[in-house]
């Protein structure tokens, strides 16, 4: 029985790897656009929708993964102390949120304009902490998810003069950032993922038939990538920028100038 609850569902890791490739593809386009000013990414064009489709897939998988981890912990725990289980989720959420804060710091230092204040890692960290009490429900998560999405779309048309509600989805008039995934509407996507996880993987069991492709060499490598999506997310942009610079597709002299100023500042 324990072996059953320790196994992974290869399709989740595979889909996460697909989302990673979509993310990398978009960021290649975005980096070229940013450094060359080609205007490739603009509101409501193909790449704008592509980025949101990528985020939707990522966050849906976050919700599904939360239900899987919850089911696994519940069935493997000899003592079902829900308080201790919740503490594990809080710690996990805080770790991911901390990585988001690191990205906030780095983008503030190197970019200034477009600083990432509440990106996808911030959202995932908060979602892991806040979603825990509702992980066992089905329809309720669907209702909450749809409500959050609709409410988020509604409040996106309103602007305020203070920045304290940016995390929620209420922006200031001249707000600009490179990565923005506020609680409303994007937490709603996580809730829908939780709903789907409870439908398709009840009690850590697949409710549908699927061929086992986990031994396929290509699938196996992709699943490995999917299992390490956080590491890929954290390192892929510096790697992409370095590669694009090496092949002469972008000029990052501005970043070198900023880095030099920071170095000289700390030498004083």
Tell me the role of every PLM-derived stretch.
Residues 1-268:
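Alpha-helical transmembrane segments and their immediate juxtamembrane cytosolic regions
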């Amino acid at each position: 029985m324990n072996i059953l609850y320790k196994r992974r569902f290869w399709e989740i890791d595979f889909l996460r790897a697909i989302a990673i490739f979509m993310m990398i593809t978009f960021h290649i386009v975005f980096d070229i656009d940013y450094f060359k000013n080609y205007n490739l990414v603009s509101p409501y064009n193909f790449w704008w929708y592509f980025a949101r489709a990528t985020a939707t897939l990522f966050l849906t998988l976050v919700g599904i993964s939360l239900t899987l981890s919850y089911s696994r912990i519940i069935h493997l725990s000899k003592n079902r102390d829900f308080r201790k289980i919740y503490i594990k989720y809080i710690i996990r959420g805080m770790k991911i949120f901390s990585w988001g804060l690191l990205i906030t710091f780095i983008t503030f230092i190197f970019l200034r304009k477009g600083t990432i204040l509440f990106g996808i890692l911030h959202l995932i960290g908060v979602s892991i902490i806040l979603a825990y009490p509702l992980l066992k429900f089905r329809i309720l998560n669907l209702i909450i998810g749809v409500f959050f999405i609709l409410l988020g779309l509604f409040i996106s048309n309103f602007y305020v003069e203070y920045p304290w509600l940016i995390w929620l989805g209420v922006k200031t008039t001249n707000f600009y950032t490179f990565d923005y995934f506020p609680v409303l509407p994007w937490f709603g996507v996580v809730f829908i993922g939780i709903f789907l996880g409870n439908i398709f993987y009840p009690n850590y069991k697949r409710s549908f038939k699927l061929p086992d492709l986990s031994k396929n060499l290509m699938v196996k490598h992709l699943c490995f990538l999917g299992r390490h999506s956080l590491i890929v997310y954290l390192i892929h942009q510096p790697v992409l920028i370095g590669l694009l610079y090496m092949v002469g597709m972008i000029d990052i002299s501005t970043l070198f100038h900023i880095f030099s100023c920071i170095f000289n500042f700390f030498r004083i």
